[in-house]
Structures are given as structure tokens and as C-alpha cells.
């Protein structure tokens, strides 16, 4: 009976290890996608024109780029 118990415990341990390994891969992929979105946003959003700079400087803010054709001003640009 103890041999059968050890085999069952070993099988449960293997199943647990296999499922936790799969979950870890999913989490990694999600984190990697989130990082890629942040990089893409920061690259595409930083289109700053002189008009935007002047518009935001008049309001004592920083130009973060154009949003829907309008200057996007903020104290600190995020993303």
C-alpha cells in the first residue's frame, strides 16, 4: 500500500509542476506584451511640433505630443 501511495504522491507532484510551469509561461507572455505596448506608445506618441511646444509653454506645461490633432499638455508626460 505504501508503494501505491508514493506513486500517487509522485504523480500529483508532477501534475502540479506541469500546470504551474504552463501558468508561468502565460504570465511571462502577458508581461512581455504589456512592455511592448508601453514601448510602442512612447515611441509613437512623442511627435512634438514647435506649435505644440509653444502652446504648452504658454500654459507652463510640457508638450506630450498631439492627440486627435490637438496639443496634449501635461506637467509630466507618461507613456
UniProtKB/Swiss-Prot annotation:
Record-level Gene Ontology MF annotations: ion channel inhibitor activity; toxin activity
Tissues expressing this chain: Expressed by the venom duct.
First and last residue of the signal peptide: 1-20
GO cellular component: extracellular region
Keyword check for Transcription: no
Leucine amide PTM sites in chain numbering: 78
Annotated disulfide bonds: 52-64, 56-73, 63-77
Family from the record: Belongs to the conotoxin O3 superfamily.
Protein name in UniProt: Conotoxin VnMSGL-0122
Phylogenetic lineage: Eukaryota, Metazoa, Spiralia, Lophotrochozoa, Mollusca
